[in-house]
Each structure stands twice: as C-alpha cells, then as structure tokens.
Amino acid sequence: MRAIWTGAITFGLVNVPVKVYSATEDHDVPLQPLHAADGGRIRYQRRCEIDGKVIPYEDIARAYDDGERMVVLTPEDLASLPAERSREIDVVEFVPDEQLDPLTFDRSYYLEPDSRSVKAYALLRTTLEDGCRTAIVTVALRQKTRLGALRVRGNLLVLQTLLWHDEIRAAAFPSLETVPPITERELALSSALMESFAGDFQPETFADEYQEELRKLIAAKIEQGESVDVAETFGEGAAPAGGGAVIDLMEALQRSVERSGGKAASAFPAAEKAPAGKNAATASAKKARKLA
C-alpha cells in the first residue's frame, strides 16, 4: 500500500507521527463506453452550450446557482480561500464507543506509526481499547477539514472520517406515526425465525454475485465470442416462490418458521405454550381431546 497522507496525531503535548492509507478499494470490473456499431471509444468533451466550442480546463470557472442568481467563481477566487494544509490529526475529545452512530461513517483509513512513534502509537491504541473510547478528531484531507473518529481495529488505529451533522437527513415517515399493536404470538414467531438465522458475522463468506457473474460473462465471451449462450453459461434460475402475492403476516411467519427448521423448529413449540385469552382455552381443549 502507498500512503496518501503523512502527519501526526496530537492531543495535549503528545505527538504521534503516522502515515495514512486507504483502508478500502473498489474491485468492480471496469467497463468502457463504446459505440455499439463500430466499437469506437466514447469521448466526453467539455463543450460550451453557447458557442459550441470545446473548452480547455484553464478556461473553466465554477458557479453557484440559487435558482435566481448565478455567482461565478474563478480559479483565482477559489485559490484565495484559506486552504487547510495542517498535517495534524487533532484530538478534540474522547467519547464512549457506543455514542458513534454508524450512519455518520464516511471513509476509512489505516494509520501506521512512524518508526520513532511505535510506543506512543501502541500506548494510545491500548488506552482507547481499555477505556472503550473513541477519539473525535479534526483532520485536513485534500485541503478540506474533516471530522473523524480514531478507533481501534485489532492492533491498528483506524481513522474513520465522519459526515457533518447537517449532512445527515432527518427521517419522518407518516406511515410510522401509528403502528398497529404486535401480539405476543407474532413476536414469538418472529423471534423464533430470527433465532433460526442467528450466527456470527463473517464477511469473507459473502461475495458480490453480480461482479462474479459479470466476470463469468466476460470470460465466456472471450472464449466463445459474440455467440455465447447466456442460458448455458449461467443456467436458468427457478422463479421465486410466491409470485409476489401478498399474504397475511402471521401466515408468512408460520411458513417461514416451519421451512427454516433447526433452531426455529425447536423454539416454535415454546411460543405456543402460553397462548392468551380465548386461544388458551382452545389450546387446552385440543390437548384434552388428544389425551382422550
């Protein structure tokens, strides 16, 4: 990996030099736009809509349009702004881990200590881990000041840039203002179904099926040419059960629990042990008939 930024974590008088690396990368298959008729590459040009000319980068300005007025900002205007070039990851405060909302997470970066700062790096990492704390920081990346979270991941410190508060949209849905009551039986069935799918998250067991199928299609076309048999290459998947029909929630839960077996099958009888009201009398009568 190649470092994209070098600087130092600072809090109080402590200074921990680090290198910053992107923690993620895109593995999507790159596809180029072509002219279907002759295979020519599609080129996008910066063409002015008024005079029709192709405009070089040095002649391109930026503008803000509020719907009524347009303010043009030249490269010189933008260059006059106080660009943030600080090389510090400045710790603002230490907060409990659970206070961070994953919705605010943006990009992730690995931090590697400088050869002279390994002990200070390890001390900060251990202090955060033992205290179940996350460091809230500000950092200048690509000339923009970003809010970030310094977190522990294994034996590493990870910088997670955060969205600003006003970048998180508020959610208010009328459909959730009045929620129908949930019965004990519905909750029991839903819990049993959830338990049947319970497990430990292992991300390596999941794969991007679309990208895998796309690579398979590309390989088939390389080998067989344009006459590739798509049905033979991918097989024909069975139509999804149910055909999109709307069914009752209880019926859907019941069928799902019965189909899942395993944990749900063993948990389901327990959900039937304490039916309420009229259901209790019905259940008792059924048991009496069975014993007779």
Curated annotation (Swiss-Prot):
Pfam families assigned: Ku (PF02735)
Superkingdom, natural source: Bacteria
Biased composition (Low complexity): 264-285
Originating organism: Leifsonia xyli subsp. xyli (strain CTCB07)
Alphabetized InterPro entries for the sequence: Ku70/Ku80_beta-barrel_dom, Prok_Ku, SPOC-like_C_dom_sf
One of the protein's GO biological processes: double-strand break repair via nonhomologous end joining
Family recorded in the similarity comment: Belongs to the prokaryotic Ku family.
Residue span of region Disordered: 264-292
Subunit structure: Homodimer. Interacts with LigD.
Keywords for this protein: DNA damage, DNA recombination, DNA repair, DNA-binding
Gene Ontology MF terms: double-stranded DNA binding
Keyword Glycosyltransferase: no
Function: With LigD forms a non-homologous end joining (NHEJ) DNA repair enzyme, which repairs dsDNA breaks with reduced fidelity. Binds linear dsDNA with 5'- and 3'- overhangs but not closed circular dsDNA nor ssDNA. Recruits and stimulates the ligase activity of LigD.
PANTHER family noted in UniProt: NON-HOMOLOGOUS END JOINING PROTEIN KU (PTHR41251:SF1)
Signal peptide: none
Domain Ku as annotated: residue spans: 9-187
Record keyword DNA damage present: yes
Name used for this protein in its record: Non-homologous end joining protein Ku
